[in-house]
């Protein structure tokens, strides 16, 4: 078996980018997801069937990557996700996700930039790269997207590949934010919607400019939030939750009580 990481090799097979790790996991995970969820999938026409692409989504639950990967895999793409490095050190799980070509992120460390290089490599190979721009589960008390990090923008502006916005809603009822217990007693409706590509071309010549990265990030997050508002049938908050102005930690777990205190501010 090649020692080259799966994300650094051209994608093959169908769904594009699949390999033995994806195929084994899909045989186990997909039947479980079908038993636990009722799927409402929309916007599948916006997902390219070939070529490099960045897909970006809101983040509310540890179940998010599984249900989103199911959508992508069932519609022709085996994604390479950026995920926190600690998961890659979990016995068995770490080997599986590494073998499937997922990319570790060393958050809040001097190795964080390594993920950018690996992700650009994956895109140069023609992969579908999945990103949660917020970098962690949203801190917004009502689960709206919060102010995101600029990693997605740096990747999008340097690679100039299409960026497809996604929103998902419902799997927080399957597994609540930072929850440990899955809801088994009823099937949970999970809605995932894709939108048209976000045009970031006005910032292509400013890929290393921080203001351009912030503006590009905001445009992608606006598209994601609009899709989520459509799903929820509600208006998004006028003021976007900014974790930098919060008492909640930027990454890592926090108590529901602390989140409720934020809501009362």
Predicted regions and their residues:
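A transmembrane-helix-recognition feature enriched in membrane-embedded lipid enzymes
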Residues: 2-43, 49, 91-100
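Non-catalytic C-terminal accessory region of glycerolipid acyltransferases
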Residues: 2-21, 113-265
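Short Gly/charged-rich anion-binding patches and loops
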Residues: 27, 42, 67, 92, ...
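Short, basic, glycine/proline-bearing loop/turn elements
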Residues: 29, 99-106, 135-139
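A conditional alpha-helix N-cap/helix-loop micro-motif detector
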Residues: 37, 86, 109-113, 145-146
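A secondary-structure boundary/capping signal
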Residues: 43, 58, 83-84, 101, ...
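Catalytic core of membrane glycerolipid acyltransferases/transacylases, capturing the structured
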Residues: 48-109
